Amino acid sequence: MASLFGDDGVDDLFNDNIPTDPDQLPSDGEGEKLFADDEDNGVEPGSQDAQIVEPKKRAVRNPRPRLTVETLRGPRGIQTIEDYFKDIKFKGKGYEKTDLDEVLRRLQHWGHRMYPTYTFDDVLNNIERLGKKKPLQVHMARYRLGQLEQMRAHEAEALEEAQDEQQEGAGDEPFDEFDALLGEQIAMSRLAPPSPQQWKMSTASSNSTLATPSFSRGNAVMSTPYSGVNATFDRSGASVAPAFDRNGAPLASMDISDYGQPLPPSQPPTPAAKKLSNEQMARIAENRRLAQERLKAKQQQESGSKS
């Protein structure tokens, strides 16, 4: 019998899209996507375009010292307590409190030297806490057996070996051409002869006046006066005859007594022109006079023949 309000028609209306086979029902992962447009346009979490924000690392610039096992094993650790009691003298019976105060005072001094930040009570509490750790117990066992010195000697040897290996590794660096060129230039500058400026600076203490070195321009030689009192000497030390002008008159000699020794030449000098003797100069002048007379006679003959 149909319902008065037509419930059967309503049920048919809502049940038309339901498949009869349960396998055709959508799975849990095939549901409709919410905000589909946003997901299509957005970036998926697992995609390559996503930027990974790394957490900032907090760097401690001035770390505060801490009371650790390494501090107790260090150069101011527990093994140095006996150094604070080397010269202690107990007063004996009747002064027990004074002796105990002296012991505590020296212990406080050691604790303050090892870790100044803590009070003496805090130092004792931390030592009691750290004393349960195995590295500190091993350290105390070696201290009682007198093996700390041997261990430190082995550590020093290992440190020296590491430094030697580091130096050897630094010596095996690749060859640098620039360094080799620089070293070659330095060696050449040491082997090169000193310049006139360096020579003058090196001989300034001897109170001698230096002459300018001689230079050559082609066949002309410009020489400088050398040291001497009444004579002139060449580079080999031999005496040189006085020079004459074109007319055969001797040139005025200069007072060169105040000149020092000549500078060593930076280049091998060209051979100087050979000096002429007095006889050769006189012969040249005579030949020149005869040639002029012959020229005048020839000119007179030519002028007479034309007239």
From Swiss-Prot:
Gene Ontology annotations of biological process type: cell cycle phase transition; cell division; DNA replication checkpoint signaling; mitotic intra-S DNA damage checkpoint signaling; positive regulation of cell population proliferation; replication fork arrest; replication fork processing
An MF annotation (GO) of this entry: DNA binding
Top-level taxonomic group: Eukaryota
Alphabetical list of InterPro entries matching this protein: Csm3, TIPIN/Csm3/Swi3
Database matches in Pfam families: Swi3
Composition bias type Pro residues, residue spans: 262-271
GO cellular component, one term: cytoplasm
Keyword terms, alphabetized: Cell cycle, Cell division, Cytoplasm, DNA damage, Mitosis, Nucleus
Coiled-coil spans in chain: none
GTP-binding as UniProt keyword: no
Cell location: Cytoplasm; Nucleus
Signal peptide limits: none
Stimuli inducing this protein: By E2f.
Annotated spans, Disordered: 1-50, 252-279
Entry keyword Cytoplasm: yes
Function noted in UniProt: Required for normal progression of S-phase. Important for cell survival after DNA damage or replication stress.
Family: Belongs to the CSM3 family.
Protein name stated in the entry: Protein TIPIN homolog
Lineage, broadest ranks: Eukaryota, Metazoa, Ecdysozoa, Arthropoda, Hexapoda
